[in-house]
């Protein structure tokens, strides 16, 4: 897993609901906890682009609803700055469901994926149709 060069603000908090951008059957996921988050006492965990979190499926197919899943944030509304000086922001907060090896569960990803995510997770980058 490569380091992300851009300074990513962590704007996806606990209890945030994100759209699912793949074809696994889930449509909406609520953040429960963020993996590898080191914060201060009593501070709620936050995630940014490229972070893995544990979520609960709120909308989707009957088989997927009410299940606990691992996800990677691929888009966020809050803008972030790349080392080149370019500022990037997306229209929505979105994620992709992954397995224990951080490989995507779905076979296609709808919408753009941040370049930082494609560099860190090669399988997500190869599945994505648009990389921004």
Swiss-Prot record:
Keywords: Ribonucleoprotein, Ribosomal protein, RNA-binding, rRNA-binding. GO terms for biological process: translation. Pfam families: Ribosomal_L14. It comes from the Archaea. GO terms for cellular component: cytosolic large ribosomal subunit. GO terms for molecular function: large ribosomal subunit rRNA binding; structural constituent of ribosome. NCBIfam families: PRK08571.1, uL14_arch. Binds to 23S rRNA. Forms part of two intersubunit bridges in the 70S ribosome. Part of the 50S ribosomal subunit. Forms a cluster with proteins L3 and L24e, part of which may contact the 16S rRNA in 2 intersubunit bridges. HAMAP family: Ribosomal_uL14. Belongs to the universal ribosomal protein uL14 family. This is Large ribosomal subunit protein uL14. It comes from Methanocella arvoryzae (strain DSM 22066 / NBRC 105507 / MRE50).
